[in-house]
Amino acid sequence: MTVYERLDRLFEQNNGILKTAQVLENGIAKSTFYAYVRLRGAEQAAHGVYVSPDAWTDAMYLLHLRCAQAVFSHESALFFHDLTDREPSPYSITVRTGYNPAALQADGVKVYTIKKELHGVGIVTLNTPFGNPVPVYDMERTVCDLIRSRSGIETQTFQNALKQYAKRKDKDLRKRMRLHIQHRYCY
């Protein structure tokens, strides 16, 4: 199998999205990869992230690859948990305090920051509509985030999300209370 065939297979295995780090892990030189990118017409979607010309672009997954510490939250998490019928625009993510979100904000991403101790609380991995895994805050954490940030959320989105959450059979009120008691997270 030639190097280009191996790269074709890597793109195929990764739904048309490939990171330079993945190429290097497979023992392929950067110069060979860049020549392949030019020849095949792949596009650079972000630093070190390339998309095949025949692949559907999964913007949520690309955002995750671009900023590994980003966790989908607020309106974006509502979408993942079926607590809203609207696709999020712009995407909402949460990063640790100290991360410089200027480049993400310039690209239209709504960025929230939170202290390091709370950043990892309630993270689950869910699939985007394209089937790619991304980190998302769980339903209880998402409701707490909405309550904390309610002044920056559309009133209709906020009310509908709380109504949908209240109707859910799989909600975990004890978990929400633990978030409140242990971390003083929900008001």
Enumerate the predicted regions with their spans.
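Glycine-centered, phosphate/nucleic-acid-interacting loop/turn motifs that mediate DNA/RNA or nucleotide
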Residues: 40
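A detector for short, charged/polar N-terminal pre-domain segments
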Residues: 1-13
